[in-house]
Every structure is written in structure tokens, then in C-alpha cells.
Amino acid sequence: MDEEETAEINAQEQEVAGSAGEAAAGPSGAEVQPNDDSVAVERVIDVFEETAEMEAAMIERFFGPSGEVAEEGTLPVPGPSADGEGSANAGGERPSEEDIVLDDGTESDGSYNRPGSDMSLDSPNSEDDSDVEAMPRWMIPQNRLRFAVDMMVSQARNQDGGIAALLNRDNFLQRVRSMVFSQERRRSRNSDEVSPEAEDDELPEHPPPPPPRPPIDIDMEEGVHFDTNLPAEHSYFGPNLNRVPGVNYQEVGSTHHMLIFLHQYILFPGEVLPFMIDGSLFDDDMSGLDGLIFAVAFPLMKPPEDSKKLYGVTCQIYEKGDNGRHLTFYKSRALQRIVINCSDIKGLPQYIARNPTNKCHSKVKILPEYFLPEPLKCIDMGSMSRFRDIPSMRDKYLRYQISSTPWPVEVCQEYAYEDIVERARKKLEVHKIDTMPKCPIQMSFWLVRNLHLTEKMMSQMFLTDSVNLRLQLIGGILKEETLFYCRYCNSSLAYCSDLFAMSKHGVQTQYCNPGGYIHETNTVYRVISHAIGYSGEPSTRFSWFPGYQWHIILCKFCAQHVGWEFKAVEPNLAPKMFYGLAGSSVRIGKAGDSATVNGNNFVVRNMLRVISEGME
């Protein structure tokens, strides 16, 4: 809508107000607004439909007539159904190679300036407090359009400019998107809890899998390769950290009384949890030089059948230091899985990342870890075991062993884990990870952290007491291609095959910012082209990776924070650039996954990507 049309609408508004002013005036002479806003709503809807027609013309340019497929195999165009809901034909073509190239890192295209964003590494605030001020240009779901417009019209009547100001096209689209996405955000946390049956009813067919992408080999980059020991040391806490000795494992099945906190992420035994907290909460409980053991529970993982129980891990502090602001830096390591009865909790538990101020204690029970060795180990003959190390004799030796047992081949293979470990090792070689533990119990947790499973699968892995079952579940997903999706709008961001280890602890590590907020970060070589925008300015302050500057990245569609871009500032440092995706803002899904967020699917997202690029 140009300036002349806006001026004409303003003149019409003034004329209508002048003619109706005397009849509608109150005792003070001020105009009394009518109760029925239907006329104004319809006028705003007309402006939106005018904008939608422009976007539909853009769709027709790329995809053919609205509602029809231009050519066989191309993406269909969604249109309103009879009941007003947006719908789309299933199917679609594979994304082009241009969609899967490396991001060129330019900041002029698709940048979002959000001063004071609380997702910076040096921000003291929580991500849940952020607000979106700018929205990308894409369609609004029809089933929530009228509700958003009703709210806008009622607000606009009490503001300067009235309805005419609402009808400015850019202002209108921005505000409607803001309202709709505020609803999307409130529902996004439950996106992974949609039942498979409901998903199948909504989308009967799966989109096609994405095409293969050219691999990236970090070893081919020139320069000095980054020392992966540095992030594991969490050196951004400063040099004033003192070692706290002592690693204590509690007896399985025993009950202990200890300090407990809550955490928004699932921690597995072996993971490092850095945090910043008031040291007075721990000083009274620390005895001598022994590290304090406390409990961390995960309220978001509470199973429906165990509504009165919390699951978590015990953690032991192994380093601490003062930051000079009445807060203490701590580094702890998760040791064992635990279960807590909610009736045993004394006090109000608080999140460890939200600057807790009160102590909360409870009884915790140490959960067991059952591991059954391979069935053939019990009949292993020492004189012939040497043949297992000869590749040409290994299969013959295995068949000989199986023939001498009462169990069928399927049973032996079901409980054999060496093949699963070998397949996992080969898959992780691509990520440059060579720190796999040898202990089966520790290895099962290590694989869960580094193979990137869905949240539902991770919860299932955590709750099982059988190491063998945990490894079997891991073996079942090794061949699946998975992606990172935006948790808010379901846009694809990056491929899990592009993960690599910037820390010796693996591809997924938790880091803490100066405000005490803990970010679960996944490091990837690259993101899908045109999937991200930028916010704010690059900075090296409090960088988790020494020698790199960080820059906040946002989802290109919904403008929500999804992570950071890291660029080398020191010469000859490799890799030159990589990305850290925030675990709280992304979810893991299969390639071509039909899982939806509020009814928007893979096909619509790829269509909107083209529209967004064209309108910019």
C-alpha cells in the first residue's frame, strides 16, 4: 500500500468521524466509540487479503496457478479449505542444491536488529523473557487471523492514528505476525508430544528425503586446528578456579538425603554441568576438601504414569572459583541416575540456572544399571578366541560358537552389542570424535549424548535400567538421517550429519553465561542456506571458544533465537567458522519428517522460504 492510498484512508476516517461525531458524542463532548468493531475488522481483513493476493501472485510466479501444481513434481500451493483452515496437498519436490550450500555469512541480507537481546553469551537474562520486534514476511495461518485482527482493532481505537494507522501494510503485517507467533511460542514446548496417530491423520504422506550434500572435511582447512580441550575447561569462567578432589559413587538402591535443584535439560552420567550460584548455598554442606554431591532433577521428563516422581542425576563439584560479584563459579559432573518421590521434597525446588536463593532437600534413590554380557561369552574357548581377531576367520568362528548353544541366531544377535558399537564408531568418525569410553555403561550414555536423538527417545533411554536395551535402541536409529528443526516454526536449520566436536566432551556441551543461564549447545559445520538471520553485533566477550567471536543467529521465518555463529578472530585458526545451535530452540527430527507444529508442514515451509526471499 503506497502513501497516496494511506492518505486517502486517513481522509475517509476523518470524514466518517466528522459526520458521526455529534450523534455519538457523550456528555463531555468526546466521541464515544461504537461497540461493534466489525466494520473496522473487515477493513483490516481486506488489507490483509490485498497483501495475500500479492503473495499469491508471487506463488503463481514460482509454482503456477493457486491451488494447482504447475508441473508434475513441483511443490503444491496451500489454499484455504471449506472450513477456513489452511490446507496443502501432500507431496513436493526435493529442495534444490542451492538450499543446501554453505551459508556465505553475509549479514546485510535477512538481518534482524534486536538490541539488548538476552540470547547473547554475556547476557544475564533467560531466553524465555525475549520478545520479537521484527517478523519476516510470510503468511499468517488463517484460523488465527481474525482473532489477531480483533485484538489489533480494539487496541488501535485508543491509540493515535486509529484504524488508518493499522492499515499501513508493513505495520499491519508486522503486528499480526507478532501476535500469531506469540501464540505459537506458548504452544511450541508441547510440539514433540503430538501423538503419531494425530500426525498421520493430519498429513497422510511424508515429504521426500533431502538430496545428499557434499561433505566437509575440517582437516582440509589450512591453519592451526582448534584445541578441543579449551571448551571443556570452561576457561571463560576465568583463571581463579580451584580443584576440588573426590569422586564418590553411591551404592545402587541406596537412599540419601541431599540438596536438589531443577534443570531444563536432560543430563546423562558423565556430562559436565557448569553453573554460577550464590556460594552460601553450598558452603555449609561442603566438608573439608571433598566435593559436594547434590541432585539435579528434570521436571520436563516426568512420565505420566509416575506423576509423583522426579528423575534426575547426582552431580559432584570438582572445581569452583569466585567471580567477584558475590557469586561462585562451579563445575560439576553427573554421576548416577536417581529417582525422587515428590512427597519427600522439603522446600521449594528452584532451577539451578535461575539464581536460586533457597535450599531444598529431599531423599533420593540411586537407580541401577543392569548389563548382560554377550551370550557367547560364557562358552568362549580361550584356545580359539584368537580367531576372532582375524577378519577372514571371524564369521566362521562365530557360526561355530552359535551352533554349540541352545539359543537361535536371532537371540544371540539381539544381545550382541559389539556390532552396534562398531557401527556407532564409524558414524562418529565423521564428527571427528575419538573419545568413546570402553565401559558399556558409560559408553551407552556417551552415545546418547553424541548421536543426537529425539527428546522422546532420550527420555526413554534415561528411564531404562538396562544397558543392553539402551544400546539396542541406539542401534535402531544409526541409519536414520536427522535434522535440526526450529522448535517454534518447524523450519529446517541444519543436518545432524554436519555435527562435529569443538570440545573433547563431544558435539553437545552445556555452557554458562555471566548471568548464570545454561545453554545446551550443538556445534555444526554449516546451516541450510537462507535458514538464518542475524541480530546485534559480533562480540568476543565471554566467548565459550577462545579465539572466536560470536554473533546471535535467528530463524529466518519466525525471528526466534536459535543459536550463535562463531568466526575465528585469530589468524590461521581452523575451522574458520561454525555454528552453535541452542538446544532449547531446536528439536531433532527425521529427514522428511511429517511432524508438524500447529498444522504447518514441510511443503509449506519450503514454499514460504521462496516467498520470503522474493519479497525481500
UniProtKB/Swiss-Prot annotation:
Biased amino acid composition, Basic and acidic residues: 183-192
UniProtKB keywords: Metal-binding, Nucleus, Ubl conjugation, Ubl conjugation pathway, Zinc
Ranges of compositional bias, category Low complexity: 11-32
Positions of Zn(2+) binding: C486, C489, C555, C558
The keyword Ubl conjugation is assigned to this record: yes
GO molecular function: metal ion binding
Pfam family, one: Yippee-Mis18
UniProt domain Lon N-terminal: residue ranges: 257-482
Subunit and partners: Likely a component of a DCX (DDB1-CUL4-X-box) protein ligase complex. May interact with pic/DDB1.
UniProt name for this protein: Protein cereblon
Protein source organism: Drosophila pseudoobscura pseudoobscura (Fruit fly)
Top-level taxonomy: Eukaryota, Metazoa, Ecdysozoa, Arthropoda, Hexapoda
